[in-house]
A protein has these predicted regions:
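Conserved alpha-helical "signature site"
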Residues: 1-146, 150-162, 168-171, 175-248, ...
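Terminal helices and disordered tails flanking the catalytic cores of nucleotide-processing hydrolases
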Residues: 1-9, 252-287
Length: 287
């Protein structure tokens, strides 16, 4: 199958994918409505027992560490806050609509654990560099940045397995180039297409599309820069490299755009190590 035919097949397959659960789309609309309140949001969540149970599970997880058990859904929503409940609804909805079939050697658990780690890193960087109001859409972006891999795993497992086999012998940064050569597009573009179909904001879908591309400083945005940096920090192996002090040219551009240096990156590496248990706890709560 030539690349043009394969690309068209990808577009048609994405059109066949299910939409987000109706509860999630209803909640997203409520979160955008300034007239919404905790009672309205809780009422919608109650109609989806699975979502309600997972929100309670997160509220009682080690990730938050509340001193008393929380059994009332409305109280859980109040304690977690609208932004976190929105992130949870999206997280759970995406995993429900697009479960990894593990047709290739890619591990669905490993993929989503990495995505949760990047999400938590991006939110923390957003809080440190900007402000709390910016942080939740960064969490969602981090969570969904590799969703295109699940599309490949579901519908193009044979081609994607070839990618994975070849990528084992190259630098991780070359993965998207191998995808482009063997599949026709990379997982960022596939993910961006899916998120556009699901009506996610363009700042999220466009950032997902280009997060592995080599970009000039004129093409960088805050979201893409934080995503690139969060992805690298998540993968960085402190067992082999004790500190981050020699960024390549592209990451140098990202650090310059964000107006941070090696010290900030090493602080975020320390943060990543400090929240490992919380990352696992959060993943287990929503999975």
């Amino acid at each position: 199958m030539d690349k043009a035919t394969l690309r068209n097949k990808i577009y048609s397959k994405i059109d066949e994918l299910p939409t987000l659960p109706s509860t999630v789309t209803r909640l997203l609309a409520l979160f955008e409505d300034k007239r919404s309140n905790i009672s309205l949001i809780t009422e919608v969540i109650r109609k989806d027992p699975s979502l309600a149970a997972k929100i309670l599970k997160v509220a009682n997880s080690a990730y938050y560490g509340f001193s008393q058990k929380i059994s009332d859904l409305e109280r859980a929503v109040a304690l977690l806050g609208f932004n976190m409940v929105k992130s949870l609804a999206v997280s759970i909805g995406v995993m429900k609509s697009l479960p990894s079939k593990n047709k290739t050697f890619i591990s669905g658990k490993e993929l989503w654990l990495h995505s949760v780690a990047v999400a938590i890193l991006m939110r923390e960087m957003g809080r440190r560099l900007y402000n709390d109001k910016e942080s939740e859409h960064l969490f969602i972006l981090g969570l969904l940045h590799d969703v295109g891999m699940v599309v490949f795993d579901q519908f193009f497992s044979e081609n994607f397995q070839e990618v994975i086999d070849e990528a084992q012998f190259t630098d991780r940064k070359d993965l998207y180039r191998i995808e482009q050569r063997l599949i026709g597009i990379d997982h960022g573009e596939a993910g961006g297409m899916l998120l556009t179909r699901w009506n996610f904001p363009s700042v999220i879908s466009l950032s997902v599309t280009s997060h592995h591309h080599s970009l000039s400083k004129e093409d960088l945005t805050k979201e893409i820069s934080l995503l690139k940096l969060g992805d690298i920090i998540s993968h960085f192996d402190i067992r082999d490299e004790t500190k981050f002090d020699e960024p390549d040219e592209e990451i140098g551009l990202v650090l310059h755009y964000l107006e941070v240096g090696d010290r900030f990156v090493n602080e975020m590496l320390d943060f990543r190590e400090s929240v490992k248990d919380e990352i696992s706890s959060f993943f287990n709560s929503i999975n």
